């Protein structure tokens, strides 16, 4: 359970209101890396799903006629699917017992995320994605109930951001494919 209490909040659709989120989160993870900080070989995989009860399918309300975002999202509903995979490949033979412990490593990554809804008139601004930036905070500077997907070379909140006043600042799906050459 999570409670969002907004009071004069200027960076989100809901300036004043209370929103409730009850969700069930399930994940399946596999990890075979040799070192969590300076990884030289192995892989990490994560598949997860998070969903809330479909309130709009059982409460009988017509959400197409509710204009107040605080009332429309009083009970947050969504289903969120994510997959993340990383593989680490040493580019030179791994050092033996007394040798140096460093080797160049190629890291490949694939990530996908999707945020779905039960009612097209009640699409949740909560739990959406915003890409760009360092990802150090785990959330965006503007909309705390969104997930920041780090992407090197871009500023925070710059890809699914507020560049156009008429565009939605939220992304409901993303994919990230990358390769990095590392020398730990």
Model-derived features: where do they sit?
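C-terminal outer-membrane beta-barrel translocator/porin domains of Gram-negative envelope proteins
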Residues: 5-184
């Amino acid at each position: 359970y999570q409670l969002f209490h907004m009071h004069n909040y200027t960076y989100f659709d809901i300036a004043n209101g209370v929103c409730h989120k009850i969700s069930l989160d399930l994940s399946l993870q596999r990890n075979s890396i040799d070192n969590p900080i300076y990884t030289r070989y192995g892989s990490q995989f994560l598949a997860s799903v998070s969903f809330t009860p479909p309130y709009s399918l059982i409460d009988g309300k017509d959400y197409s006629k509710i204009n107040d975002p605080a009332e429309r999202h009083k009970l947050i509903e969504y289903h969120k699917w994510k997959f993340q995979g990383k593989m680490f490949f040493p580019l030179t033979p791994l050092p033996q017992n007394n040798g140096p412990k460093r080797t160049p490593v190629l890291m490949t990554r694939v990530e996908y995320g999707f945020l779905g809804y039960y009612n097209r008139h009640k699409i949740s601004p909560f739990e959406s994605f915003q890409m760009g930036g360092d990802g150090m905070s785990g959330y965006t500077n503007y909309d705390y109930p969104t997930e920041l997907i780090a992407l090197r070379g871009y500023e925070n909140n710059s890809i699914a951001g507020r560049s156009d006043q008429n565009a939605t600042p939220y992304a409901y799906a993303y994919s990230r494919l990358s390769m990095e050459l590392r020398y730990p």
